[in-house]
Amino acid sequence: MSLFDFFRRPTSAPVARERLQILLAHERAVIGRSDLIAILREEILAVIAKHVTMEPEKVNVKMERGDTVSTLEVEVEVPTSATARAGKKVVEAA
């Protein structure tokens, strides 16, 4: 980069291309959000089902996207009888 290039205004094509790439990335993130949540919910249900018998309706998955941080919130209602059985399995395994 020479000294003369430093004071030159950037051409509009690269700026427009960069803005378009940002816009497309944002659109893809918004469109794919519902699919991602459904996939995560099914995988979380599969993992929980390995250890506890429960109803799939008792699992809520929610994703919130902010400007800088995305948050995944998972709420699971585990029956008290299931936690007692899981504790016995851990004791028996030891």
UniProtKB/Swiss-Prot annotation:
InterPro entries the UniProt entry points to: MinE, MinE_sf
Pfam families from the UniProt entry: MinE
Top-level taxonomic group: Bacteria
Cleaved signal peptide residues: none
Record keyword Cell division present: yes
SUPFAM superfamilies found in the cross-reference section: Cell division protein MinE topological specificity domain
Keywords: Cell cycle, Cell division
Gene Ontology process terms (BP): cell division; regulation of division septum assembly
UniProt function note: Prevents the cell division inhibition by proteins MinC and MinD at internal division sites while permitting inhibition at polar sites. This ensures cell division at the proper site by restricting the formation of a division septum at the midpoint of the long axis of the cell.
Xref: HAMAP family: MinE
Protein family: Belongs to the MinE family.
Protein name: Cell division topological specificity factor
Organism: Beijerinckia indica subsp. indica (strain ATCC 9039 / DSM 1715 / NCIMB 8712)
Gene name linked to the record: minE
